[in-house]
Amino acid sequence: MAYIAKSFYDLSAIGLDGEKIDFNTFRGRAVLIENVASLUGTTTRDYTQLNELQCRFPRRLVVLGFPCNQFGHQENCQNEEILNSLKYVRHGGGFQPTFSLTQKCDVNGQNQHPVFAYLKDKLPYPYDDPFSLMTDPKLIIWSPVRRSDVSWNFEKFLIGPEGEPFRRYSRTFQTINIEPDIKRLLKVAI
């Protein structure tokens, strides 16, 4: 069994720029974590909505995208190619994320990133689709397989300002529709 952090604030990641992202600096802010892929069918929609949420809550929300190639090999770029892929291919049109992206990682299996080991332990399935599973077993390329595994690109995890995982959302739940939960956590009038 992989090590699972005791607290959200004990976690960290490495950004696309190679710098450490220390989650301890997120105290007092809500955090939205989403596994992303630049060649998925919903890349344009999801990246646009992540940008929108980051812009609506610039100081009180941290949005982190974790590129992952475990679902249909839809993030097959190297770390240094991801931003150019988003800018010129899909999303395209000069798109630039307004939120932080980490280096590519696994979200499932033996080599899963500690952030996802922690989040899946605290939130074992999406609240909007508790029966969500990988739809095509032939696409499972990791081991071991667990019921709590992320099932595809663009699954989301929302963490409250005290570092408590609040809710997990399936890939079919549109990112922008998380806004009421963010407002609730930040106690902003809806």
Curated annotation (Swiss-Prot):
It comes from Rattus norvegicus (Rat). InterPro entries: Glutathione_peroxidase, GPX_AS, GPX_CS, Thioredoxin-like_sf. The gene is Gpx2. Belongs to the glutathione peroxidase family. Mucosal epithelium of the gastrointestinal tract. The active site is at residue 40. Pfam families: GSHPx. It comes from the Eukaryota. This is Glutathione peroxidase 2. One of its GO terms (molecular function) is phospholipid-hydroperoxide glutathione peroxidase activity. Catalyzes the reduction of hydroperoxides in a glutathione-dependent manner thus regulating cellular redox homeostasis. Can reduce small soluble hydroperoxide such as H2O2. Can reduce cumene hydroperoxide and tert-butyl hydroperoxide, as well as several fatty acid-derived hydroperoxides. Cannot reduce phosphatidycholine hydroperoxide. CDD domains: GSH_Peroxidase. Keywords: Cytoplasm, Oxidoreductase, Peroxidase, Selenocysteine. It is found in: Cytoplasm, Cytosol. Homotetramer. GO terms for biological process: biological process involved in interaction with symbiont; negative regulation of inflammatory response to antigenic stimulus; response to oxidative stress; response to salicylic acid; response to selenium ion; response to symbiotic bacterium; temperature homeostasis. It catalyses: 2 glutathione + H2O2 = glutathione disulfide + 2 H2O; a hydroperoxy polyunsaturated fatty acid + 2 glutathione = a hydroxy polyunsaturated fatty acid + glutathione disulfide + H2O; tert-butyl hydroperoxide + 2 glutathione = tert-butanol + glutathione disulfide + H2O; cumene hydroperoxide + 2 glutathione = 2-phenylpropan-2-ol + glutathione disulfide + H2O. Its main location: cytoplasm. One of its GO terms (cellular component) is cytosol. Its EC number is 1.11.1.9, 1.11.1.12.
